[in-house]
């Protein structure tokens, strides 16, 4: 496809992409030909420049940072410094998704190639931009595997935060060389010595190695790349060996299909080659190879040490599994797959239903398209008595679910109802069988309850950084959420690092929102899996006139059943209208009522036309009305609109 913008021939200074609006006249055939020739010359010049750079001059690095510490802004400054983009181009070049820009988070791993000349020789740098949130930890670890080091970014005004700590330990465990960067030194609230001291005490990195910068203004950013070249080792790769490539990430392009981001560990890869997956043993024809500069730029070939893209002609995006190894077809004998492959494992499950049931078919297509771009989401159809046809979705975490819902609404304009999140519970039966349940409907009913030997629920180790003055509030919050304290560490500048083991089910129920609330927004949170523990869990059903509302059924700890039941019945009562008969709203556990609310019958004055003295007729009409209401209560059915479920399930209520 011919690009309608000119790529400059000077490689060290890259002009911004020109925006073409409908008012611009179309190019003539001669202009298109000249542009095509110019692009081809530029592409060849880039390829020749890469081929001249020895692998000893490659540097692959990432940026480790807490959310909102300036990772995307620093990336922009580095791209400007190396001439990949010009100053003034759109901010957050590496954040491709709209939701990434709006939330200020990175969801998909991205990369960009940069050239740097220190006056003596050329260097090829690959910046691998990774998600920072624990929900996307699988993508983070695969991205780190393609790097030799990382920039450890710390906000000078906020200091070390939870996500920084968690990602530091992940990077450190993978042997990455870390360069500490103190960012936002231009702020009035910046405490540079305090941030440096935190880096030294928390991570045992020499504070003298810290580089103090302002990514916003560009102050001192020019010191970073020389430090990368000096401290981060070149990739340990060999171009002469048979091809081995690690899949770092992938996405679906509507025009070319699946695009895969690969770290070429050994060998060389070019258009027309056949490659094979180590995991599935499926073969693919490579349609295109290239580098991200910052967008896709086709090359003749890519080689060992590079982090680059290929278009493999893959039909099903779910075949692209992060961490998979690819070989050249017919030349894989005796080769070992690269370490680190693991299937995405959903840990949070929700029921999803269209707000308007008539839109199911259209929304099903939209849902399938979105899942194409996110292989970590599991999708299967399910039916609810209350909400009709829908889907059961599995996500890596609550943020992952929230991002998916937001993308569905923004990219397709869909209105969707999500049920309360459920985590995977393990059930061990007395006959030796084991079952993992992700839906409250799968929970054993009363007839099978005595067959169960034990229930297990997943736990996580939560890492929180909070101001010392709010430590008591946070400890109370953790205790109320069945948390168990594991460690407490006093950082400098009045910050405390808390480690708690907390049930995952408690964490996905807006724990982070409550944490922010009790610390006035100053706390940060990260977590990692801590295995399964025995637990006394039960199924809490919400019934309206004896009819269970499956969309509102949830699994909780027995100690919380009564309090949660009272909360549910009083909350749902607000969204039901009065009927001509009395309506009972009950919360049940093991068929026993633990909480109840009653909606009084709508009263009609059947005696308004009677004479005051007609007592017998008065009593007769009231008795008849009473009998009618009794019969209606026994046989009548309460019609509940989807709006009521949607309002009940909305978290901000």
UniProtKB/Swiss-Prot annotation:
Compartments in which it is found: Mitochondrion inner membrane
Membrane protein topology class: Peripheral membrane protein
Binding positions (GTP): 65-72, 129-133, 183-186
Primary location recorded for the protein, binned into one broad class: mitochondrion
Single biological process term from Gene Ontology: positive regulation of translation
Keywords: GTP-binding, Hydrolase, Membrane, Mitochondrion, Mitochondrion inner membrane, Nucleotide-binding, Protein biosynthesis
InterPro entries: EF-4, EFG_III/V, EFG_V-like, EFTu-like_2, G_TR_CS, LepA_C_sf, LepA_CTD, LepA_IV
Catalytic activity as recorded in UniProt: GTP + H2O = GDP + phosphate + H(+)
Highest taxon of the lineage: Eukaryota
One GO CC annotation: mitochondrial matrix
Pfam families linked: EFG_C, GTP_EFTU, GTP_EFTU_D2, LepA_C
Molecular function in Gene Ontology: GTP binding; GTPase activity; mitochondrial ribosome binding
EC number: 3.6.5.-
Residue ranges annotated for the tr-type G domain, each copy included: 56-236
Family of this protein: Belongs to the TRAFAC class translation factor GTPase superfamily. Classic translation factor GTPase family. LepA subfamily.
Note: This protein may be expected to contain an N-terminal transit peptide but none has been predicted.
Cited NCBIfam families: lepA, small_GTP
Function description: Promotes mitochondrial protein synthesis. May act as a fidelity factor of the translation reaction, by catalyzing a one-codon backward translocation of tRNAs on improperly translocated ribosomes. Binds to mitochondrial ribosomes in a GTP-dependent manner.
Protein name: Translation factor GUF1, mitochondrial
Organism: Candida tropicalis (strain ATCC MYA-3404 / T1)
Gene giving rise to this polypeptide: GUF1
